[in-house]
Design a protein with these regions (language model features):
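Surface-exposed charge patches
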Residues: 31, 91, 191, 250, ...
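Hydrophobic alpha-helix-in-membranes signature
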Residues: 104-105, 183, 264
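Catalytic alpha/beta core domains of metabolic enzymes, predominantly
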Residues: 124-130, 137-242
């Protein structure tokens, strides 16, 4: 089993004015996050509008990403409900030497742990060399992993099921498995998670907090006093007042208007919320200039 650890951003997707995927700028965006302190990124997570982007565009991006300078530092989100499409997308990704996948179980439908286990079993059977990070986000997909379900999956597939992104926050303090990465989905859980044995975070707001998050992570690993954690938590709590994708694109678009482009039904913040977000970050002395792509 190959764990992942550190600070991972759920990287944003950059779109052209016709709402097609801008491959060059999406890759550049992810690379900038790594340059700013992230250990890696998740490409095509929910923050990257994965469920809204055509598979053909995703594959085209992966072809370019496979030749990029940080090609080994990316997790690939599937963002698909269909089992067969998920498997086919993973096989194409695998052919490009991407082996680590962030996979959310299907949305819309009601099902039990047994059904979730069956879903991942079919994926592992079809792509046995894959390494899978489970995506626990009940708010988005309607299903919440139990500790027992994850324990059963890891017992069944110890070499394939290597971690979980916990955005429902029912696991990160309680799930204890050897050689298994537990990654909360919020900076507000970073330090508490590390103290509980977690491996790091995978979050949307690391698109702007990469430097702060890395500082908190490194200080913990080096047994230094925490000088930045409260500010990091305050910044995350500020973003949590809004739709995260809308807030991030609104903030980035102040430096580069290409970030105004969002796939429906997503949209930018209204002017009142934009003003409040910017002012709240200013009140926190949160400097974003060096972190926004020009």
């Amino acid at each position: 089993m190959t764990k992942i650890s550190g600070i991972y951003a759920a990287s944003m997707s950059v779109l052209n004015s016709d709402l097609s995927l801008n491959i060059e700028k999406t890759i550049s965006h992810a690379e900038n996050l790594i340059d700013q302190g992230c250990h890696g990124t998740a490409i095509f997570g929910s923050t990257g509008q994965a469920q809204l982007i055509p598979i053909a565009e995703k594959i085209k991006l992966l072809n370019s990403l496979s030749e990029s300078k940080y090609k080994d530092k990316h997790l690939i989100g599937t963002g698909l409900n269909s089992l067969n499409e998920t498997i086919n997308f993973m096989k194409i990704s695998f052919s490009l030497n991407f082996k680590k996948f962030l996979i959310m179980p299907p949305a819309y439908y009601k099902y039990r742990d047994e059904d979730a286990i069956n879903f991942y079993t079919k994926i592992v059977d079809a792509v046995p060399e894959s390494r899978i990070i489970l995506y626990n986000f009940e708010k988005l997909c309607g299903y919440k992993f139990s500790i027992e379900c994850i324990e059963r999956l890891v017992q069944k597939f110890p070499n394939q099921i290597i971690g979980v992104k916990d955005s429902s926050y029912n696991l990160f303090e309680k799930l204890k498995l050897k050689n298994f990465s537990v990654m909360p989905g919020s900076e507000s859980k970073l330090l508490k998670g590390l103290e509980s044995g977690c491996s790091g975070i995978i979050t949307a707001t690391c698109n702007v907090t990469s430097q702060l998050s890395r500082k908190v992570y490194d200080d913990f690993k080096e047994n230094k006093n925490q000088s930045c954690n409260q500010k990091l938590v305050d910044v995350r709590n500020t973003f949590d007042k809004y739709n995260l994708i809308s807030a991030l694109h609104t903030l980035y678009s102040k430096k580069n208007r290409i970030y105004e482009n969002l796939l429906p039904p997503l949209s930018l913040l209204n002017k009142v919320d934009e003003k409040n977000l910017v002012q709240s970050l200013k009140n926190l002395n949160f400097e974003t200039k060096s972190q926004l792509a020009a």
